[in-house]
Amino acid sequence: RKAREMVQRKNAMEGGSLPGKLADCQERDPAGSEIFLVEGESAGGSAKMGRDRKFQAILPLKGKILNVEKAREDQMVSHEEIRHIITALGTKFHSRIAYLAEPDENGDTNGDNVSEFDLESLRYHKVIIMTDADVDGSHIRTLILTFFYRHMRPLIEGGYLYIAQPPLYKGSKGRNEEWLYSEDDKDNWVAQQRFSNLRILSKNGAMDLVGAGVQKLLKSMQTLETSLEDLDEKLGLSGDVVLQGFISGELSQASVDEVLEGRQLSFMDEGRVIWNTQSPTGEPVEITLGQASTPQFQRTLSAYREAESALQNGPYAIERQGNPVEDGIGWRQLGEAVERHADKGSLNIQRYKGLGEMNPDQLWETTMDPQTRTLLRVTAEEAAQADDYFKTPDEAFSVLMGDSVAPRREFIQTYARQVANLDI
């Protein structure tokens, strides 16, 4: 009630006007209108200059908005950026508690907490979250999503909420430029530029790769090599010995799981030997359960699985434009061999972490133009798989954004070893 009264007082004081920093569009039909919620005043300025003012509205957001999962509703409404979102969209908001309540015999789900949310008053039928492609941008996007899920959920259920996809990179070779929207896009573009004239064949005929396939093979082998070196540096284990254990099948995740049998790793378990062999010089080598349970070992095992077929199918030969140029290449030498025969033209890859790094024309071309952009529609569905950690979106928001630390710690500990790209 306090939150609703606060909104009413502010609307009365402001005369029901829209936020001053909102650059509204000319279109008055909500079905033909869209609004971008843009991270940062600088990017908001570029978006205002680059937009099509006929149907695109821009609302810049300053800094990180309030985490509504931890705040009272009166605190939420007093937060300036959230108040601007509520006012700009025109729908007001619903109480989190009210939305979750069961309806009474009159169909009223809210009692004293009657929701004032009015979907019919929505001023734009596309509400687009546009944040930077970095850690801070992801955090701000999550905070905005938390607000919409808790206090404007019908926007999500009605399919009105979207996430913009700005590019991560711009690749250029000579006068040719291309916007790249993901790590895969970048890798494929590099492969196309450098390896399009190359072909890699395995001696046994099981592998025949060109272009992006060459890039993927080299990446898997490089990851494995780095992981094996990490084992030596961090755990004092010979990477070559561990690799032979993987190849023979004697050393695997199954051997770790068999010892634990579903238990949590205990102090007594850590020293238990799960595999022993000899090094090439005849020295005994033992691998304990504690070592096999470390992130370094698990990453190496995962890298081996990715590169397993490549290790089994060598040695390799390379053709360039259909002509044999080198053969008898082992997996460890393949990367250097490919570099010798790849196209040497200069490539330039520019990383775009912030929306403000693009000028108005670039922002329009990559992220705002309906003819070329990519938008992700936000949905909220229950988990389809029985082994998913979160069974409902409600549980996910509660654990990841709420006050309780213990469930969040448990989630992090459960999935820490699966992290592939950690950006801190």
Question: How would you name each of these model-derived features?
Answer:
Residues R1-I424:
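Conserved phosphate-chemistry cores used by DNA topoisomerases
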